[in-house]
Amino acid sequence: LKHGIPTVSRFGGLLELKDKKPMRFVEIIMYDGTSIDPLEIFIRSGMTNYMGAIKTGNGKIGASFREFPAHSRDMVEQLADRLKRIGLGGLVKIGLPGQSLLDIPVNEGRIGAIVIGGLNPMSIFEETGVRTYSRALAGLIDFKRLFRYEEMEDRLREFL
């Protein structure tokens, strides 16, 4: 968003890897159909195989599918390269305008992109029998609990 690229997050899913290459989504949950992060569901359900993905290049990892305007493809690629250089390479694959990406249809005038899910490292714990409690940085809150950011310092003083 900082770079003026409007993004549509379509779904979170389990991305199957073979020989370290993304093959297909084997499960998906549309973001507009849940208030829980789909990756949390897949991890807690024991559906991931992140250990296999990092050890052999074959497994199932959490990933999300995003869409960007087609004219922003070059900028998205540049940003992905910059992030990768500093160790934050999360974009797995970027599609072509109006073309399906891993058999997922993309709206006309848009490109698809697959982004590695941030909760994936937590799946290692679950896969090895260590129960975890994690929540994505999203959720619902009662509107009455919100306040202006200028009040933050005073509110923090109440707790210190």
Positions of predicted regions on the chain:
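Anaerobic metallocofactor- and corrinoid-dependent redox/one-carbon enzyme cores
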Residues: 2-160
